[in-house]
Amino acid sequence: MTVRGRGPERPAHLARRDFLAIAGTGLAGGTLAATGVTGLGATPALAAEGRPSPAVAARLRVGYTMPTLEFADPNTRSALGAAYESALTDLIGINTVYAEPSTYDTAGLLSYPPGTVVRAGGGYPSPQRWTRDAAVNAWNAASLVSPLVGRNTLLAMVEKRPDGSLIVQQDNQWWDQIIWVVSAWNHYLVTGDSAFLADAYQTSVNTMSARQVQNFNAGLGLFEGPSFMNDGIAGYPSPPWEPGIKSSFVLDYPNTNKIMCLSTNCLYYGAFLALDGMARALRNTGAAASYRSDAARLRDAINKHLWRTDAGSYGYFVHGAGQLSGQLDTSEEGAGLAFAVMLGVANPDQARSLLDNAHWEPRGIVNSWPAFSMFSDQKPGRHNVCVWPMVHSMFGHAAAIGGRTDLFARAVTDLARLTLGSSGDFYEVYNSKTGAVDGGWQTDGSGELAHFTSQPSQAWSATGYLRMIYSGLFGLNFTENALRFAPCLPTGWGQLSLVGVPYRNATFDLTLTGAGNHVVSCTVNGRPGQAALPAEATGHHQVRITLDEG
């Protein structure tokens, strides 16, 4: 069990621009020239971890391909380019680390080489075998830019049970486990790795079965457990928070194991759909149909118990025990709203409404809102009215999916500015009013409010930005039989290109012109066609898409 909080001082690591210079990259002529860097040694992060020297680590290759982001408009380049450079460096040069077999390969599933995984980030002690961070980072970007590292990062979270069967590592943060299923299905869609699919399906079936037995509330049709993001008590109002408890961990507070949260239940819905997809891909039609039915019932329950018709949005959680049992907490949960749109829990009308009504702070989307009674503008709650870039980025992607080009533009530029204000580093948490690096306030082991540290070089903050670029701006939508393009290009950003993108056995360059999210025309290698590449594509392809507001 790991609660994100205080940690040791930041480890030394290779400077961002130094890393990209070594990798043969740079920032010139409107181009982040980071194309096609493969076989790149993982030595910067290894050094930061106290791992083998470059000579010893030479055999440990990460195999990344870093797509180039090209800008026709210098203002757009100035606003967004440095953050893209920093995000790639954070993922590849800082947070890709050696996977010590005794720690990370307990199930015997990792590949050596590359022998690396994506860790959570700076400031926290090693090892960082954290399911939630691993799944988010693979889902956001790692599975695309390095399928082998993405695969290792996911499989490092798997353990073998005494009977030899596979399951996501079991601990007392059970609500973290199910996002692994969503991320694993995405990895298969991106890579087409059938060997991975077989292990992922077994792992996902066993993980879901365990959670259904232990954490499903049959009366309400929802899964119990804290919010996806909020393992710290600062993410909850009173109740369940109460004074005098000497802990920051959510489960140390009464009845928190019984709450039923929007974000977590949306992820279970996504996991059921992922299991349906995996089962179909493995030709297990009976299991697929069962998982589809489970998904439909859960979606109905979420919309019955958590949708607020009066507010045109979702509430945060349903109390599962105590005096408020059965009542909906009406706070707004940033990750929950994002997942409701991203995973399809919200119908189109609901998605439009919640995007219209979502609360923005001056520097972005926050973890939860409004401020709970124990916090204030001077002492913002760590998991309350603070900007976590990972959550903010998920909401940005949701805005793109929902066709809100304006909100998507705001999300991307807000995070780029936060990063610029913190010397190009992707920190863990920011003050939602000022944009300063700020870990927020939370009850600690003394039972009193304490100011926590915002840790540097957090991989999921960086991959969140990459998610907004790859999946939001360029609209990379991976399906079983094709990569489909659904871009979201804000007005005034000018022509943009993503060059050298890997997709299974092919690569492609994608150029966007116009503005909006409606595809007016698409050419593939100069010929008019659908905005898609088939999964069986090979070689290199040129894709050009013209957009308007529709």
Which stretches of residues belong to each language-model region?
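Short helix-capping/linker segments at secondary-structure and domain boundaries
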Residues: 32-38, 145-149, 345-351, 403-406, ...
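Aromatic-rich carbohydrate-recognition surfaces in CAZymes
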Residues: 127-242, 261-269, 386-399, 405-408, ...
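Extended glycan-interaction surfaces of carbohydrate-active proteins
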Residues: 74-127, 148-170, 217-259, 300-389, ...
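Active-site neighborhood of glycoside hydrolase catalytic domains
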Residues: 265-305
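Acidic/polar, glycine-enriched structural segments that form the non-catalytic walls/loops
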Residues: 44-127, 194-196, 205-212, 279-287, ...
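N-terminal secretory signal peptides
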Residues: 1-18, 25-29, 33-34, 38-44
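Non-catalytic C-terminal accessory modules of carbohydrate-active enzymes
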Residues: 394, 398-550
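Long alpha-helical scaffolds in large eukaryotic adaptor/regulatory proteins
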Residues: 30, 148, 191, 279-282, ...
